[in-house]
Each structure stands twice: as structure tokens, then as C-alpha cells.
């Protein structure tokens, strides 16, 4: 062999051995404290990728759960949950069922507020049971975790990270009551940033801006009731008065499952990272069963229909209306539904208990997507460029539908008031009107035009926090100011006092000068007149 070639090869081999011996690739330890439902499904992809990169992950979950089950890429650690599975599912699934019950707006509002209160109480009691489990807390403390990855919608993970003094990375869509804005000290002008649940866009009329400004006041009481249990628990554990905002403010990085293709543009802070579409990065080939359904659809293609994991059954009358509408279009309908089969179900409609939603939407034959407007489904529609018919049921789904409708990428239906004709017309509109396909493809192109995939970006920031043991340099000094310092009210008051003092001195000086200049002449004139008389 040519000795000139061997020398470089020997050098390259030595370099590779040296690189393998370096300690930089040593894995870290991640404590994962997830939220139930679709929140966990996208966080799970991050945990899987962290495991693939050599990190150890421990997922802390309640004994009673719907979606969180043990898998080979993490260790599942459970804790006692003070509710039965039936009670838990009743509370979790209750909001979805109410979406199909017609009732007055005022009643709906107060029932929604009561549901939010029950939801927070349920998780607050669960959190108290966990944090008072001294054996488990000692075990977690001795495990020397490098970072806590948690969803602050369930603030217990943030509280645990604060208590154990471990850097935290938050993985979220948003936090109720606007707490995420307060905890990040992110500006939120009500003139163009719509509040959650208002169903407003970023272009508001005067009356809409009035509504947007007053809306948080209507939630003030229920928000106070909802967060008080966590604040009491935080104060008890940390031995000082602690607000929930203060607990959440110690997050190193906030990973928001959003971007400005879907969300309205707004100010952001240095420790806020946007990973919208993270749930639709990983795609798999269709199984033989679903491939057969798609191929059999012919030139008309398929429509994917799913109202999310929280909707297991629809009232019979409404289900029959939906089935009637679906039977009127030429496309093949793949409907994820576990309820009673409608008696009028057409031949073109296939009921399945589960479907690979993202993979089906990514197929060239996907013509439309009927969705409840959850953020995961919306992003899968955007990623794959499929126009949507949206049937929002509760929570932020109404806001999500409003965003997509504003962008001309879908049609929104009121699930309570819609008829079979309404659904039929909406489907035909988004399928046959080319503008909807063009708009969603434009959004898809914008969304995909990025320097790094959302999953890689999320994993990078988790590893970043592990490497640097937090990210205090990204935390704005606004956290250390009082409310009057933040708004510079003390400075304004000081400057105003100076101005008023100067004005007062000038006024007094002028008054004194006037008296000196004109007061003496007046007295002279008066005395002169008295002498002439």
C-alpha cells in the first residue's frame, strides 16, 4: 500500500479515538413532569429525542392517567393520586361533552369558570399529595437531576423544580389567566394582543378593544381561586410568601408550542423560544389498513375527521346530522370515533377508534381536515397544507379557529347550531374553492421555512440549560422591580414633583416681583390722591 496514503489514515484514526475519549458527550439526567392529554403527546417526542442523544429521562406521572404509560426510552415513576380513574376521566372529559350541550351564554360562562376551578383543584390536590410524600421527594433530590422539563399549565412541576433547586425548562402552549405573560415579564398591549378565550384577532375595532381590556377583569375572581391552592402550597414548602407568578418566573427557558404563522405577532423575551409544529415533525408510512382506505378513495381523495382524544361520544342526534352530511360528498371519510355507530352512516364513511392523523394528512390524497381546532391538529393541518373545517368545543379552540379563519385557511362551524347542510357546504367550500388550498399552502411554506426543526430546537435548549446549569443571563431584570418601578411611576412622580416645585417657585417669584413693581406705584398714587383732596 502507498505509504503516502497510510499516514493520513493513521492520523485520522488517532483523531477519531481521541474524540471518542472526550467527556463532552456524557449524558445528563432529565426529570420530566408532564401534563395529561395532547400536552404529553408532543412532550414525549422531546423525551424520545433526548434519550436518543444519550440522556436519561425519568417521567413523574400520577398512578391514574389517560395517556401516560411506560415506554422503553424513559423510566416511569408514579405517585399516589387522590382520585379514582372514573372521577379523573369525568373531570377531564366533562368539558368536551359540554361542548355539545345547548345552553345560554351566561350559564356556559359560569359553568366554564366552575370547570376551570375544579380542574385546578383536582391537580392542586394531586400536587399536595406528591410534595408531601417525603420518601419520593428525598429520592428525587438524591437523583441529582440536571433539569426539570415540565408543562406549567400544571404548576406542580415548576414548584417541584423550585423546591429541589433544579433549573427548569417549560414546555407549553399557554397558561390560563395570562400568567405566562406575567411570569416572563413580557409586554402585552391590549390594543393588538387579544386575550385568551376572547375570539378576537389582532385587528380590533374600538368596541373589541374595550372588550379585550375588560375581559381579564371578569376572570380575576376565578383565577384567584384557581391559583390560591398552589400559592399556599408554595409558601408552605419554601417557608415564605410566594405567588404563582414568582414560582414560574424562575424558569430558565420557555418553549412555546406556537409560531407567528399561526399566532399573531407580539413582543417576546430572550428566554422565550417558539417550537410550533413540533408534533408533526415525525412521520411514518401508513399501515396496510389505512393505505388500502386511501387507495380505494380514487380521484376524490380522503377527508380526515377527528375531534381529539377528549371526545369519545357525540349525542345521537348530532352524530346522525354529521353522518348525513358526510354521506353527501364524494370523498372517503376517515372518522375517528369511539361512540355508538350512527344508523345512517354512509358507505363512504369509515369509523375507526384510532387513526394516524399526521400521516394521513401528509398523504397527497388528503383533501380536507375536520377538526376540533386543538393546537396539535391545527399545526398538523398547517404542516401538511390541508384546509380545515373547524368545530371548536372548549378552551382555546375557539381562538385557534378564529386565527385560521382570519387567514383564509378554513371555515368555522358552531357545533351546537350547525345542520347537515352547513357541514356539507363547509366541506364543499374548502375542497372546491381553490383559495383555501392556496392559503393553507402559503402558511405551510412559511411555517417550514426555518433554519432548524422545532424538535431539534427544543432539544437544543434543554441541553443548553443542562450544560450551563440554567440560563440566568436570559432572565430580564424586570423580575426584580416592583410594579411602580417597572412602570417608572416613582421616576414620573419625582420628575413631576420637580416640575411642580419649579412652577411653584416661578409663580411665587413672579407674584413677589409684581407686588414689588406694581404694588408700590399703587400706594404712591393712592397717597397722592389723598393729598390733593
From Swiss-Prot:
Q: Which family does it belong to?
A: Belongs to the UDP-glycosyltransferase family.
Sugar-modified residues: 133, 141, 295, 433
- What is the protein's species of origin? Rattus norvegicus (Rat)
Q: What PANTHER family does this protein map onto?
A: EG:EG0003.4 PROTEIN-RELATED, UDP GLUCURONOSYLTRANSFERASE FAMILY 1 MEMBER A1
Top EC class of this enzyme:
transferase
Residue stretches in coiled coil? none
Q: Cross-referenced SUPFAM superfamilies, in alphabetical order?
A: UDP-Glycosyltransferase/glycogen phosphorylase
Q: What is this protein called?
A: UDP-glucuronosyltransferase 1-2
Where in or outside the cell?
Microsome; Endoplasmic reticulum membrane
Give the matching Pfam families.
UDPGT
Q: Which domain of life is it from?
A: Eukaryota
Please give the GO cellular component terms listed in this UniProt entry.
endoplasmic reticulum; endoplasmic reticulum membrane
* Matching InterPro entries: UDP-glycosyltransferase, UDP_glucos_trans, UDP_glycos_trans_CS
User: What does this gene product do?
Assistant: UDPGT is of major importance in the conjugation and subsequent elimination of potentially toxic xenobiotics and endogenous compounds.
